[in-house]
């Protein structure tokens, strides 16, 4: 039986692979792929009023090597940052509901 963390790692890798390569390099995500990924995979955290310039800004923050694409390392660092922000946000919340065992 796979554990939740194992499932999470697999989901991170598989999600990247699902969206990467439609614009060219199969190991990178271009801006249109990133936009689709955010809208479909993180709809609760992607404001519906996001404009194209908002996606441009987001892309420029993620694209640390400035090659106009997001590689797997940049993608993982962005998810790690998201996890850190969530941890900070939720650490003061009451422990209900409990985490799945």
Curated annotation (Swiss-Prot):
Record-annotated EF-hand domain positions: 12-47, 50-85
Binding annotation for Zn(2+): 83, 86-87, 93
Subcellular locations according to the entry: Cytoplasm
Disulfide bonds: 30-68
Tissue specificity: Skin specific, specifically expressed in cuticle of pelage follicle.
Swiss-Prot/TrEMBL keywords: Calcium, Citrullination, Cytoplasm, Disulfide bond, Metal-binding, Repeat, Zinc
GO terms under cellular component: collagen-containing extracellular matrix; cytosol; Golgi apparatus; plasma membrane
GO-annotated molecular function: transition metal ion binding
PANTHER family, A to Z: PROTEIN S100-A3, S100 CALCIUM-BINDING PROTEIN
UniProt subunit comment: Homodimer and homotetramer for the citrullinated form.
Protein name stated in the entry: Protein S100-A3
